[in-house]
């Protein structure tokens, strides 16, 4: 399960060096305003999907993907977020 997440994070990190015209992820990494807009949009769509009990998994995946890209673009490592969550378990 988490291997897929790790693979996604690695792909996002690799896309930093791609041409934004050829990679959607690279485009998001290079345009933080667009990425913030997408995260907001995807969260709204997830909430609507949960309320309608329809397409929840798809929308949740979109939120996770866009959030991971935004974190990476902002210099926030998912590993640091996971460490913070682990601290909160105590």
Language-model features: locations:
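Flexible "arm" and connector segments at domain edges
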Residues: 1-60, 64-90
